[in-house]
Structures are given as structure tokens and as C-alpha cells.
Swiss-Prot record:
Superkingdom of the organism of origin: Eukaryota
Underlying gene: IL2
Protein name as annotated: Interleukin-2
Organism of provenance: Moschus berezovskii (Chinese forest musk deer)
InterPro entries hit by this protein: 4_helix_cytokine-like_core (IPR009079), IL-2 (IPR000779), IL-2_CS (IPR030477)
Main subcellular localisation: secreted
Length: 155
């Protein structure tokens, strides 16, 4: 009698694990990754706001899109990746001897790596962007707020 219930429970567990559902052991890693992402976004914001770097002035005139809905799930990080690619193109971050640009490129590469790890196998999500655009600093601030929100729900 209990055999059917046990088999059903095992099948459900396997289905959840196969579909990338978070398990309790991965929650700690996810928290660390979200915290790292938050710190990298804050570092990138500091570098972007640095008035000494003239090449960044171009970026301050560029408009970025933010998701239409209030982002509350890790799958929304796909939207960050899409816009981060545009930021990289705006900065034209080819190998540079400029220390600030290299640090920005390193931060962006690290952010992309962390986002890909956090997304896992989720590829079906499509970003819906708001019609209004924001400047680079506000764009980064919105994603910092997103990470803080995600992190606070995990603790």
C-alpha cells in the first residue's frame, strides 16, 4: 500500500530535480552567487560613475531598457544579460590598456558568468521590456535592487 506512495514521491522528486528545481543544498550556493552578483553590480556602478574616465561619457547618453514587470525571479536575469551585451557594445570594450575599462570589462565578464550559473538550464523565458528607457546608472541601480530583493527573500 505504501509502495505506490513511495514510488510516486520518488518520481516527483526526480522530476523536480531534472527540471532544475532548487534543492536545499543548492540554496546556499545560490545565495552566494546572488551576493557575488550584487557586489559585482555595485562595483560596476562605481566604475561607471567615475567622472575621470572620458570614454565612459558616451555611455551616459545611451538608453537601456528594463523589464516591464517587477522582476522577482532569477529567470529575469536573462534580461540583464541582454542589456549588458548592449552596454558592452556601447563601451566598445576591446582589449584596452586603460585600467578602468579593463576593470569594467572584468566586472561585466564576471556578472555574465554568475548570471549564466544562476539561470541554469532555463532558456525558455522571454524578456518583456518597458517602453521607458533609463540611463546606465539607473539601469545598474535597478538590477542592484533586484539582487537585494532576491537575496533578502532567501535569508
Amino acid at each position: 500500500m505504501y509502495k505506490i506512495q513511495l514510488l510516486s514521491c520518488i518520481a516527483l522528486t526526480l522530476a523536480l530535480v531534472a527540471n532544475g528545481a532548487p534543492t536545499s543544498s543548492s540554496t546556499g550556493n545560490t545565495m552566494k552567487e546572488v551576493k557575488s552578483l550584487l557586489l559585482d553590480l555595485q562595483l560596476l556602478l562605481e566604475k561607471v560613475k567615475n567622472p575621470e574616465n572620458l570614454k565612459l561619457s558616451r555611455m551616459h547618453t545611451f538608453n537601456f531598457y528594463v523589464p516591464k514587470v517587477n522582476s522577482t525571479e532569477l529567470k529575469h536575469l536573462k534580461c540583464l544579460l541582454e542589456e549588458l551585451k548592449l552596454l558592452e557594445e556601447v563601451l566598445n570594450l576591446a582589449p584596452s590598456k586603460n585600467l578602468n575599462l579593463r576593470e569594467i570589462k572584468d566586472s561585466m565578464d564576471n556578472i555574465k558568468r554568475i548570471v549564466l550559473e544562476l539561470q541554469g538550464s532555463e532558456t525558455t523565458f522571454t524578456c518583456e521590456y518597458d517602453n521607458a528607457t533609463v540611463k546606465a546608472a539607473e539601469f545598474l541601480n535597478k538590477w542592484i535592487t533586484f539582487c537585494q530583493s532576491i537575496y533578502s527573500t532567501m535569508t
